[in-house]
Amino acid sequence: MRVALLMGGVSREREISLRSGERVKKALEKLGYEYTVFDVKEDFLKEVDQLKSFDVVFNVLHGTFGEDGTLQAILDFLGIRYTGSDAFSSMICFDKLATYRFLKDIVEIPDFIEIREFMETSPLGYPCVVKPRREGSSIGVFICESDEEFQHALKEDLPRYGSVIVQKYIPGREMTVSILETEKGFEVLPILELRPKRRFYDYVAKYTKGETEFILPAPLNPSEERLVKETALKAFVEAGCRGFGRVDGIFSNGRFYFLEINTVPGLTETSDLPASAKAGGIEFEELVEIILKSAFLKGEVRA
């Protein structure tokens, strides 16, 4: 099997993608797969036709282009098989506002509103969360407890993103649920609880060793564990996601509040999904092979 490994990309998550890609590359080598690495940059469309000579694309492009449905639509058009969710699901899940609107009657979501213009005060009160519609790795996310902090967040995000989501802040335990697809169906991995040393699970906390305490499995009683896993799987399936992914949320007062779905989650040495997989008895090389094989569960590919 010939594998095209796509890494790097043009988003603000490029460095994380390169780290994910390097780790996947070593795993593919150990597994004995024939592979070629593509460091995706601005001129990638000039070489995209080369992908037709491969059996499958292993996509570890995080953020815009690789995770927002753009790459997936191109590969669908060319009839090239790839890992992860399809173009529509990727597009929906990368846009948090679209995700919330799509899933609002299916799972519990903290109150939210879209803002396109500067405001003096939060329409949802404080504390609140300000975050971009389309971004990953907690880039551009602010927790605001005053008008001053709220205004600062808008001044940072609105010029860059054009619009932001303001969401009610739910105090509670941050949890992430990783999901794999195998020929037996969807497998929900052990729930990971995140206890960052910083104010919340931001970019630094995600990708710096020692900045976050990982609790695996999360200390939940059986009914709480069932609630979290069932909610995460319901969101994942209803959004049409495939292959592998991660669902993030807040567990508070016996309720699990959905926050987002990551359709191309990190695969670095500090990433959540590999940690959950290992807790479930799946070493990294096996995880890579499961993800790779899941690309062949999506039916016939037609150009």
Curated annotation (Swiss-Prot):
It catalyses: 2 D-alanine + ATP = D-alanyl-D-alanine + ADP + phosphate + H(+). GO terms for molecular function: ATP binding; D-alanine-D-alanine ligase activity; metal ion binding. This is D-alanine--D-alanine ligase. It is found in: Cytoplasm. Its cofactor is Mg(2+); Mn(2+). Cell wall formation. The keyword Lipid biosynthesis does not apply. It comes from Thermotoga petrophila (strain ATCC BAA-488 / DSM 13995 / JCM 10881 / RKU-1).
